[in-house]
Structure formats: structure tokens, C-alpha cells
């Protein structure tokens, strides 16, 4: 009799190993998917921020009239160029209106004349009663005449009172009158500044005459010492003057000079050339 073959259990073992490998692969795949999705979300947020910043920059580049415009009006006017033209026309109109308003002289309101108010019927009726009462009181006062002694005393008292009042009123000095104005103008300093009138010999600024000796002063007003070295004052824009020394001309930064200074330097060089030719 041939011996029977034993059955082996390899198939179930292989299946369990495959299942474990599949489960580990799925776990790794899920973790990788989560990492990639998080990175994509972060990149989307960064892209949105960049788009927002670029959008704001482009809006800032536009003129103010278009920025204040509604987007419906912007689209209705047909895009950027037409909207710019419309905004420019509106700006020109506004400037014309403001210029006309500023140029128009100010007209003061005419003072209303105060008309005399006519008395009413009630006041007319009350006035005769008042006049009657006044006449009665005057008659009573006239009936009682004061004696001569009382008259003299009253006259002396009135003279004394009037003298006191006139003395108080007559003592008004310029300093007393200025005290009333201090509330409006403010108090003057204790020590009044003294100005030397010999400094201001000319009424206004003037250009120095030909071959006139000129002395330089600082911003504080103190005179500056004379310089042995040769220098040139070159007028520039906004009333500024650039001083160029003979020793510093070679190391001068030309880019800092404006166009007016360039023109003045060229004119000076041409004049100096003529003068040097005459000296030869």
C-alpha cells in the first residue's frame, strides 16, 4: 500500500502575511495623503495672501477717482482707459468750480435797518395814565420847598461828591487803559526787547553792487571770520546758495547739483574764460 501524502497549511499563512502587508500599506498611504493635503492647504492660503497683496498694490497704483468709483460704474464706463478719462474730466470740473469759488469776492450781508416799532393801542392807553401820575408827583414835590440851610448843605455835599468822582475819572493813565486790553492781546513781557536800528540801514533785501565789499553772517546774526581760500557762491533753486571752495571742486559730487546750479556754473566758466583772455 502506498503511503498517503500529508496536507500542508501554507495557504492560510500566505494569506495572513498578505493581509498584514496590505494593512500597513494602507496606513502609510493614508498618512502620506494627510501630509500632502495639509501642504496643499497651506500653499493655497499662501497663494491667496499673495493674490490679495498684489490686488491691493494694483489698486493703490490707480488714481483716487477710480478707487472711489463703484465697480458697476467702472464696468459701465468701459474699462480702465475710459474710466480714467471720465475721472479726469470730473477732476477738471471740480478744480474749475473750486477756483471760481475762491476767486469770487466775499460780500458782507447788509445791515438790517432797525425800524422804529409803532406803539400798540394798549401802550397808547397806558401813557396818559403815566403822564397824569407824574404831574401829580411833581406838583407835590413843588409844594414842599426846602429851606435855605438844607439847600446850602446839599450843594456842598454835591460839590464834594462830584470832586471825588472827577478825581477818580481824571486819573486815567495809559497803563490803566492798557490793562483792559490785556485780556484780548495778552500780557507784555517784563523786559521789552531793544532793537539796534543801526543794523537795518536798508529797507529791504538788495543785490550787492559791483566791487562792493560783502561780509557774511550766520543764521544767528553773528559775523563770520574772513577766509583766505578762494570760494564761489553758486545760486540754486528755492533761494539756496552753494559755496564751492577751490580745494573741494575736484571732489564735488555733481549728482547733488540741480539744473539751475549747472547753468550758473556754465555761465561762470564762460565769463572766466573771457576774463582770462583779457589778462593774457
Swiss-Prot record:
One of its GO terms (biological process) is mitotic sister chromatid segregation. Residues 140-187 are annotated as: Disordered. The keyword Transcription does not apply. It is found in: Nucleus; Chromosome, Centromere; Cytoplasm, Cytoskeleton, Spindle. Keywords: Cell cycle, Cell division, Centromere, Chromosome, Chromosome partition, Cytoplasm, Cytoskeleton, Mitosis, Nucleus. Residues 140-153 have a biased composition (Basic residues). GO terms for cellular component: chromosome; chromosome passenger complex; chromosome, centromeric region; cytoplasm; nucleus; spindle midzone. Gene3D superfamilies: 6.10.140.560, 6.10.250.1900. It comes from the Eukaryota. Component of the chromosomal passenger complex (CPC), a complex that acts as a key regulator of mitosis. The CPC complex has essential functions at the centromere in ensuring correct chromosome alignment and segregation and is required for chromatin-induced microtubule stabilization and spindle assembly. Contributes to CPC function by facilitating loading of the CPC onto chromosomes. Component of the CPC at least composed of survivin/birc5, incenp, cdca8/borealin and/or cdca9/dasra-A, and aurkb/aurora-B. Interacts with incenp (via N-terminus). Belongs to the borealin family. Was named 'Dasra' in reference to the Hindu mythological deity Dasra, who acts as a harbinger of the dawn. This is Borealin. It comes from Xenopus laevis.
Amino acid at each position: 500500500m502506498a503511503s498517503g501524502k500529508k496536507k500542508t497549511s501554507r495557504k492560510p499563512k500566505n494569506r495572513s502575511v498578505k493581509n498584514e502587508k496590505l494593512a500597513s500599506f494602507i496606513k502609510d498611504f493614508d498618512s502620506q495623503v494627510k501630509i500632502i493635503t495639509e501642504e496643499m492647504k497651506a500653499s493655497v492660503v499662501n497663494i491667496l495672501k499673495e493674490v490679495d497683496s498684489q490686488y491691493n498694490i494694483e489698486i493703490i497704483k490707480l488714481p483716487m477717482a477710480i478707487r472711489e468709483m463703484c465697480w458697476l460704474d467702472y464696468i459701465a464706463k468701459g474699462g480702465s482707459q475710459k474710466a480714467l478719462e471720465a475721472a479726469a474730466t470730473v477732476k477738471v470740473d471740480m478744480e474749475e468750480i473750486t477756483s471760481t469759488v475762491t476767486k469770487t469776492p466775499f460780500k458782507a450781508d447788509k445791515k438790517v435797518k432797525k425800524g422804529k416799532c409803532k406803539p400798540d393801542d394798549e401802550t397808547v392807553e397806558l401813557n396818559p395814565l403815566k403822564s397824569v401820575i407824574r404831574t401829580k408827583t411833581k406838583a407835590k414835590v413843588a409844594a414842599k420847598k426846602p429851606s435855605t440851610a438844607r439847600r446850602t448843605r446839599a450843594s456842598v455835599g454835591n460839590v464834594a461828591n462830584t470832586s471825588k468822582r472827577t478825581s477818580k475819572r481824571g486819573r486815567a493813565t495809559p497803563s490803566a487803559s492798557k490793562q483792559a486790553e490785556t485780556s484780548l492781546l495778552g500780557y507784555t513781557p517784563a523786559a521789552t526787547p531793544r532793537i539796534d536800528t543801526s543794523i537795518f540801514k536798508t529797507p529791504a533785501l538788495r543785490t550787492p553792487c559791483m566791487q562792493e565789499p560783502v561780509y557774511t553772517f550766520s543764521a544767528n546774526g553773528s559775523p563770520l571770520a574772513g577766509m583766505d581760500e578762494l570760494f564761489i557762491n553758486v545760486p540754486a533753486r528755492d533761494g539756496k546758495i552753494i559755496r564751492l571752495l577751490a580745494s573741494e571742486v575736484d571732489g564735488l559730487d555733481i549728482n547733488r547739483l540741480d539744473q539751475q546750479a549747472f547753468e550758473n556754473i556754465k555761465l561762470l566758466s564762460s565769463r572766466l574764460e573771457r576774463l582770462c583772455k583779457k589778462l593774457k
